[in-house]
């Protein structure tokens, strides 16, 4: 199998779409990543796709069919790429890291076993793949000019693998540190931060590696943002979590001052503030940017076309219309479904029905979404809970022997963009989830559970009289009470209409439909 050489890097005439503020607009009419042109984003995607291809084919010694169909092969290939990327990134910043020590030690290779297959990685070969693919488009000696942009997009390619681990184990604690012996991990339970047990599934991303959390700070769940800011020191890294808090809770009165107070105080001072913020979030949702993640091996193939001579050609036009949150992601999912009809997937899971549900949750982050919404938008009527997947997570482990079993991804009937703003126009209990995290922004009928009603009972009205603990708690308590008073046992949410998935093409969206699916009060993590 050959891959066509990268297109010429000579300047070509391009069209740049802008909004009224002169900012470039990406697919779906959204503002493009700051400082990054559409041409540059396409170049980065191409470079990463080439890396995945060469790691799978040249280093792992796997086939093009493995690249397309074996979800786990792609995840492990992306793991190596993410590691070597952070190795070069740390070197460029004159820093030290555990991955740097691993790459720079005396051995030339390292090995791991994936479902009965021993894979040997040559470090210099891995470095070479990364450097060759990057320098197709970027000047290696000007790493500061491109590393930040590459880092963000690279993290989005790596998101699928990180989320697959999260779907296995719901976060319940914040990792404070890993001791030098690498055997002791210091953690603090979320309840130590004032987070109700029934809302720990809002901690999406909490167990991601620090480099992933930092790269995608504005896509982390609200609990993750709160605990990271609670522990943050007032340094260059804390700013990311301040910004993430301001975005996620931008609908909260005086959030700028609240963020400033939280940064300056220790976790023990912030417990009631955190609890009130999450109680409010249970009703209103939060504004972090939700993301759709694709299996990296399959995505590398989806960005190419295969000709009659078995040669892959990068499809620049398709890549330019691709994104991780809007119509571009659903367009790619439609293409994904067509490719998988001829090339069914494998995840080392025998039961195809369970495999396709795990894939869907990992791609769309729907392990925190209400089953009523999922039943309405897909061809699946019987969604399973985490307790139904014990055997499947055993066979998913890399150390487990190979398990035969192919499956096809879940078909969609309707779609809407994933949430990046409040999903409502209106501004407790035990460890079972008290409400869902809204992933899709399509219209819905929400239910208010008794557990949700009980949140914040320890304690938009008043202004903030002073920047102190008591004043902030009073403000949030009164704001929560005003929100509770505005809601009954159910309310209408959603900011856009659902669209027909079968009408979606690369050039137009599906037709809008008048529907408002109702929640049923159950999610993947429910008891």
Curated annotation (Swiss-Prot):
GO terms for cellular component: helical viral capsid; ribonucleoprotein complex; viral nucleocapsid. It is found in: Virion. Its main location: virion. Residues 1-26 are annotated as: Disordered. It comes from Quaranfil virus (isolate QrfV/Tick/Afghanistan/EG_T_377/1968) (QRFV). The lineage of its organism: Viruses, Riboviria, Orthornavirae, Negarnaviricota, Polyploviricotina. Encapsidates the negative strand viral RNA, protecting it from nucleases. The encapsidated genomic RNA is termed the ribonucleoprotein (RNP) and serves as template for transcription and replication. The keyword Transmembrane does not apply. Keywords: Capsid protein, Helical capsid protein, Ribonucleoprotein, RNA-binding, Viral nucleoprotein, Virion. This is Nucleoprotein. It comes from the Viruses. One of its GO terms (molecular function) is RNA binding.
């Amino acid at each position: 199998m050959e891959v066509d050489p990268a297109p010429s890097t000579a300047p070509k005439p391009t069209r740049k779409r802008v909004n009224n503020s002169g900012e470039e607009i990406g697919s779906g009419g959204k503002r493009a990543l700051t400082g990054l042109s559409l041409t540059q984003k396409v170049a980065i995607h191409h470079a990463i796709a080439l890396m995945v291809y060469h790691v799978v084919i040249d280093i792992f010694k796997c086939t093009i069919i493995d690249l397309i169909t074996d979800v786990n092969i792609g995840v492990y290939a992306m793991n190596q790429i993410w590691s070597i990327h952070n190795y070069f990134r740390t070197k460029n910043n004159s820093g030290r890291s555990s991955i740097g020590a691993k790459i720079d030690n005396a051995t030339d290779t390292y090995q791991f076993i994936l479902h009965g297959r021993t894979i040997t990685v040559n470090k210099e070969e891995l470095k070479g793949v990364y450097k060759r693919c990057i320098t197709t488009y970027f000047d290696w000696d000007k790493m500061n000019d491109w590393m930040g942009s590459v880092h963000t997009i690279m993290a989005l390619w790596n998101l699928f693998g990180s989320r697959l681990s999260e779907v296995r184990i719901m976060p319940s604690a914040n990792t404070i540190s890993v001791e030098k012996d690498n055997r002791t991990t210091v953690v603090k339970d979320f309840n130590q931060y004032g987070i109700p047990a029934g809302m720990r599934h809002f901690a999406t991303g909490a167990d991601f590696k620090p480099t992933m959390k930092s790269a995608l700070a504005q896509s982390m769940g609200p609990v993750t943002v709160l605990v990271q800011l609670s522990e943050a020191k007032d340094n260059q890294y804390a700013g990311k979590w301040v910004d993430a808090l301001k975005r996620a809770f931008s609908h909260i009165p005086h959030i700028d001052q609240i963020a400033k107070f939280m940064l300056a105080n220790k976790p023990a001072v912030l417990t009631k503030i955190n609890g009130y913020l999450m109680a409010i979030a249970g009703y209103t949702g939060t504004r972090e940017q939700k993301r759709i993640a694709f299996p990296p091996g399959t995505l590398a193939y989806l960005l190419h076309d295969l000709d009659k001579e078995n040669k892959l050609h990068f499809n620049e036009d398709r890549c330019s219309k691709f994104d991780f949150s809007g119509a571009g992601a659903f367009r790619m999912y439609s293409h994904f479904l067509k490719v998988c009809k001829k090339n069914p997937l494998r995840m080392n899971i025998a039961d195809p029905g369970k495999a396709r549900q795990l894939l869907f949750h990992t791609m769309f982050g729907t392990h925190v979404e209400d089953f009523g919404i999922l039943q309405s938008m897909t061809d699946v009527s019987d969604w399973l809970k985490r307790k139904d997947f014990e055997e499947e997570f055993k066979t998913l482990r890399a150390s487990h022997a190979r398990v035969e079993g192919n499956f096809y991804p879940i078909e969609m009937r309707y779609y809407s963009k994933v949430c990046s703003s409040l999903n409502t126009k209106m501004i407790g209990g035990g460890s079972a989830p008290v409400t869902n995290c809204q992933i899709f922004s399509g219209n819905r009928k929400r239910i208010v559970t008794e557990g949700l009603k009980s949140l914040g009972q320890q304690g938009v009205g008043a202004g903030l009289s002073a920047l102190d603990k008591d004043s902030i708690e009073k403000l949030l308590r009164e704001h929560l009470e005003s929100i509770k008073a505005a809601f009954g046992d159910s309310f209408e949410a959603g900011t856009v209409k659902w669209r027909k998935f079968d009408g979606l093409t690369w050039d137009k969206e599906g037709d809008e439909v008048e529907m408002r699916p109702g929640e049923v009060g159950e999610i993947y993590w429910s008891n």
